[in-house]
Amino acid sequence: MIGTIAVLVIAILVIFAFKKSPSNIPPIVETIPFIGCFYQFAKNPLQLVRNSYDRLGEIFTLHLMGFKMTFVLGPEAQALFFRGTDEELSPKEAYRFVTPVFGKGVVYDSETEIMYEQLRFVKNGLVLSQLKKAVGIIQEETEKYFETKWGDSGEIDLLYEMNKLTILTASRCLMGKSINKSLGQSGQLADLYHELEEGLNPISFFFPNLPLPSFKKRDAARAKVAAIFHSIIQERRRSTDDSVDDVLYTLMNSKYKDGSVLEDEQIVGLMIGLLFAGQHTSSITLTYTIFYLLNNLEYFDETQKDINDIVQKENQGEINFDGLKRMNRLETVIREVLRLHPPLIFLMRKVMTPMEYKGKTIPAGHILAVSPQVGMRLPTVYKNPDSFEPKRFDVEDKTPFSFIAFGGGKHGCPGENFGILQIKTIWTVLSTKYNLEVGPVPPTDFTSLVAGPKGPCMVKYSKKQK
């Protein structure tokens, strides 16, 4: 009996392995029947995608434990992804695995119309007037942090420090001084967000609720963050101070089209998601920016000249929005860092209706994906793609969907301007106050869906003499 079953299983696997697929679907990368290339994907997803591109070209499909993930790479192919309609491509269906972090009824776990209304509320809280006010807040918190935590000299893990500093400054901008009263500069929020980040990895995309240690830590961290944010919301409701105007205020006073207001749990989820999306991008990009600048003194000197001319000479030491916008070299450096090291290695949508690309049909049910990390390092898109050359951005690249670090189309990142502003402000304060010594640019850790430098990223610092 057992022998008969074994023969049947082997026969099914053989049929699976040699079964021909329709000729008009994208070429398939498949190694083991049913399992496919899941092991390679879990171990090093970027290497698998890049190798598949080199072998199969701009469109191909990975078989992953019953999931089919079709990648489109290069500006022309990526246009299919970014220009797809909601009827064709659903971000909501692709990103349900983030529900343990964002929460129920928030963004990707809500109906499509509700999701777009929630995203509109967030954008309303990040308008120009808020960005201008944010500069002073970021400067104040950054200076206070260095004075209380760094002192005159020492050695630190830069990524760890920038994680704490970016979430400290972002949370103050988004939620006001209440967050300081709750946490001060303890770094607790950064540590909790690190646990959330560790709970989003390639395995979580397929099985987000497995009883894994990293997922248990993620869920515990989420509960603690939610409790902190709930207490801040309750304090805000009790307050009689009507001068507060931040993103939290915007969310608490927003209404859906039917006239209903956001529930506190939805506000908490949106704040968690907004901070999560911005914090890891900013801290990773800021860390890499500092390493690249100090390993490329030509660009370091140019950015310092801008800071000296704009901040010190013209504005008598004041950092403001208009001055930061004029720091063009620093902006090109940040964009080049994002091209080389985009924190989000994959962007995904679920295919709802079959889609065509150059004679190939992508069936409904597939996950359609682009990889900023692979797509922005193609030699057909950027000359010397693995080299750090910020001057390539001195002239605007008008090729649609060649630079996709912030996504593209109607699903572009709403916090792009805030993130760049935050990085510029922190670097301006840091480079004005301290001399830094760094080693080579660290490699990237691709074991998480949020890819940052492999730590520790040790940096020596000493306060500049006035």
From Swiss-Prot:
Cell compartments where the protein resides: Membrane
Sequence positions that bind heme: 413
A cellular component annotation (GO) from this entry: membrane
PROSITE patterns the UniProt entry points to: CYTOCHROME_P450
Enzyme class: oxidoreductase
Native source species: Dictyostelium discoideum (Social amoeba)
InterPro entries: CYP450_sterol_14alpha_dmase (IPR050529), Cyt_P450 (IPR001128), Cyt_P450_CS (IPR017972), Cyt_P450_E_grp-IV (IPR002403), Cyt_P450_sf (IPR036396)
Transmembrane segments: none
Primary role: Sterol 14alpha-demethylase that plays a critical role in the third module of ergosterol biosynthesis pathway, being ergosterol the major sterol component in cell membranes that participates in a variety of functions.
Protein name: Probable lanosterol 14-alpha demethylase
Phylogenetic placement of the source organism: Eukaryota, Amoebozoa, Evosea, Eumycetozoa, Dictyostelia
GO MF annotation, one: iron ion binding
Cofactor(s) recorded in Swiss-Prot or TrEMBL: heme
Coiled coil (UniProt feature): none
